[in-house]
Amino acid sequence: MPSDLAKKKAAKKKEAAKARQRPRKGHEENGDAITEPQVAEERNEEANGRETTEVDLLTKELEDFEMKKAAARAVTGVLASHPNSTDAHIINLSLTFHGQELLSDTKLELNSGRRYGLIGLNGIGKSMLLSAIGKREVPIPEHIDIYHLTREMPPSDKTPLQCVMEVDTERAMLEREAERLAHEDAECEKLLELYERLEELDADKAEMRASRILHGLGFTPAMQRKKLKDFSGGWRMRVALARALFIRPFMLLLDEPTNHLDLDACVWLEEELKTFKRILVLVSHSQDFLNGVCTNIIHMHNKKLKYYTGNYDQYVKTRLELEENQMKRFHWEQDQIAHMKNYIARFGHGSAKLARQAQSKEKTLQKMMASGLTERVVSDKTLSFYFPPCGKIPPPVIMVQNVSFKYTKDGPCIYNNLEFGIDLDTRVALVGPNGAGKSTLLKLLTGELLPTDGMIRKHSHVKIGRYHQHLQEQLDLDLSPLEYMMKCYPEIKEKEEMRKIIGRYGLTGKQQVSPIRNLSDGQKCRVCLAWLAWQNPHMLFLDEPTNHLDIETIDALADAINDFEGGMMLVSHDFRLIQQVAQEIWVCEKQTITKWPGDILAYKEHLKSKLVGEEPQPTRRTHNV
């Protein structure tokens, strides 16, 4: 029987629930959308009917695409761990896609309390493996709930805060049931049980926690109350990520979660994921992020999954040591085999004593062969990206003079009275929070946007190449990379010459002649980089070039940028790439641009200090660059 104290507590909650149910006008309070009766909803749906239909069609198209991918995927495996265990061990795991074998007779080991970084080359099947786990095509025990972040939230009239809170279906269901029972006159033990369960779920703190997560991902309080349909796809992806963090599943699968984040949000997410205590499987090509988050690394290579303890740097060190030992063992075995074969050939038909020794060595050789020989270490293919020589043009290449910019006449000012110049020796990384105008600045410099006030002067012969996140959308998906590049650059007549050009960007063999739609996202990015390089620009403006690229490709890109003769401005959430290629860090915020006095690692520490409310140590300039 419930105690008197529990009854009083329930009575208070019951009264509060009744108060919440009193008639209210259609507005928002504390981030929860409060709507008028069904008539208002129907009126709203009618007004937005066409938009809703378009969204539904796009959503269905994505679902159909996922179903086709799932139909083309075949997975086999056997659960080896105890059915009630919180760990998941799968043996004899094989994975094929469109008949191509991605994994063969390997094992998947995911242990509670571990945060795994899944790494491997572009197109090797990392995302496909996550999808197979998320769809439960891999025999994960049913009591382990899985949340796989696959795509952005579709546009809707809901707010980001509502979208995040509604993902916790158990809490939402319990709150609805509690409100219903609160209006019944009789005392109800069921109501007390509901309140006790809600307390276990920290239901009274749910909104605060959802708001904290959204804030960490860059949503201001005002943005948390805007309608989802007013946000871009990148921001809606952040909402989807916030839902994944809010629900706290037992197994969380994240595929490139930093792709749509700025450096501030990346630092926050890194700190947030460090506290994840269940099972996290993360695909990321940011070495810095993998180092900060992961306790283990899974290397997908040669159709196998190989496991390493520690973060990415520890994986590199351990793998190098293991491969050195493997090569020593390989050479020793090959020397032994050569020696025994030579002895057998020389003395196999000699005297009885020598013949017996030769027979003994032949048996030893047969045992070695039967037990399996050490394989030679096969290194990953080394990429060599290339930006052709651009020639010299005298400075100033681009001059920005008293430039101000706003998107609309009555809109907020993005920049105010900018004054700086860039030349062929410029190596700058633009950093700052989302919405500060980093991509906007690149568009102003290329001429895609015009200043509201002031002037941007460019050398008459300067050629600018801008890489941005939507460049893939310009690809003709029905053409192969070879056909697409031949179409874009008709001056290159020989297919073999074009094959060599594309090959430098890591697209070889069948990848060059397969339709672009069949390539992975990382491989499509390589097509875009090849296309951009052969534009032969003097200035490279790179807006998030690392999205979907593997670690080896990012390193090749860094080498190519460092060898490039022209100027470079970079927007990236990859701290390591910035450290490799940038000579200056420019911070975009508060309608201006200031030069950071240290390197990007010092800037990261500054962002970390902001998370805990500390004041940054460096003193920045307060004037334009």
Swiss-Prot record:
Residues the entry annotates as binding ATP 2: 432-439
Region (Disordered): 1-54
Superkingdom of the organism of origin: Eukaryota
Modified residues (Phosphoserine): 514
Gene3D superfamilies, per the entry: P-loop containing nucleotide triphosphate hydrolases
Residue(s) carrying Phosphothreonine: 220
UniProt entry keywords in alphabetical sequence: Acetylation, ATP-binding, Nucleotide-binding, Phosphoprotein, Repeat
Basic and acidic residues biased stretches: 40-54
Residues covered by the ABC transporter domain: 88-327, 398-615
MF term (GO), any: ATP hydrolysis activity
Coiled-coil ranges (or none): none
Pfam families tied to this protein: ABC_tran (PF00005), ABC_tran_Xtn (PF12848)
Positions annotated to bind ATP 1: 120-127
InterPro entries, alphabetized: AAA+_ATPase, ABC_tran_Xtn, ABC_transporter-like_ATP-bd, ABC_transporter-like_CS, ABCF_EF3_subfamily, P-loop_NTPase
PTM sites of type N6-acetyllysine: 306
Record-linked PANTHER family: ATP-BINDING CASSETTE SUB-FAMILY F MEMBER 2, ATP-BINDING TRANSPORT PROTEIN-RELATED
Family (UniProt): Belongs to the ABC transporter superfamily. ABCF family. EF3 subfamily.
Name this protein carries in UniProt: ATP-binding cassette sub-family F member 2
Lineage: Eukaryota, Metazoa, Chordata, Craniata, Vertebrata
